[in-house]
Amino acid sequence: NMKFKEYEWVAGLYKCFDEGIVNCRDHAVRLMQKILKKEKNIIPVRNIEITVDRETGVITMMNDGNGVDVAKHPENDLWIPEMIFGHLRTSTNYKKDEKKIVGGKNGFGFKLVLIYSKWGEIETVDHIRGKRYTQRFENNLTDILKPNVRKSKSKPFTKVSWLPDYERFGMKGLTEDMFNLFKKRTYDIGVVTDKSVKVKFNGRAVPNKNFEQYMDIYIGPKTETKRVFEIPHDRWEIGACLSPLDEFTQVSYVNGINTCKGGKHV
């Protein structure tokens, strides 16, 4: 069960974690869309694995499925993975008039994670070109080390690891409250990602329930708390009940993002 409690959190650190895990979920959605369009050489995401080291504070996120294109960009001669992860405004998620089903941040997202990290590492396998790419970023993204590119016959995946700059966040290290928030956020992703994708946190599978069942974690079973639940659209699921806290509360997600402050959708 999910328990309501007061906790101390650092919004910037939480957002860095959120950016990484939403990227994993976004990748699963995009590849599914490509498969529906019958594009070739698409391997779907089947696993998302999140690891948070409680001692060192290092965070690692991995998803399988198509990796990043391991090739040099024709215009600026930079490796595409370095552009995506290490240079601002280099994604393709810019069209404001386009209906969005992903939670990307218009080219800023993971670069900001690295700016607030002592170091970060990326690794990806491009099964189409048969290449594995690894690269390290240090000192809050001021130092971009030379990538290692080699041949590979492995299945595709992308993995990112980073050590947040806890001092910049006014912290001595990873706290118990932040660790638990990261764990809870991983559970969220498990329920807003397609059921064909297995989600793990520190090696253990998280419950990949439907949204109605996920409500039980917050408010208890139907026999305990009466509620109404509807799916008016294939991209909308809504549940409501009397608040157990005797005041208005809400839990909501939009394109995988936890909208903890609500919004027009609420």
Label every PLM stretch briefly.
Residues 1-6, 97-105, 249-260:
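Short, conserved non-catalytic motifs in the polymerase core
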Residues 1-17:
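Conserved short strand/loop->alpha-helix "switch" segment adjacent to the catalytic nucleotide/phosphoryl-transfer site
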Residues 1-2, 54-55, 151-161, 238-254:
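Flexible hinge/switch segments at interdomain interfaces of large molecular machines
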Residues 2-6, 24-49, 91-102, 123, ...:
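Active-site phosphate-binding and catalytic loops of NTP-dependent enzymes
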Residues 19, 23:
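Conserved polar catalytic motif of the HATPase_c/GHKL fold
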Residues 25-92:
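Conserved beta-strand-loop-beta-strand hairpin that lines the nucleotide-binding pocket
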Residues 55-77, 94-219:
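GHKL-type ATPase core
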Residues 197-266:
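GHKL/Bergerat-fold ATPase module in large chromosome/replication-associated machines
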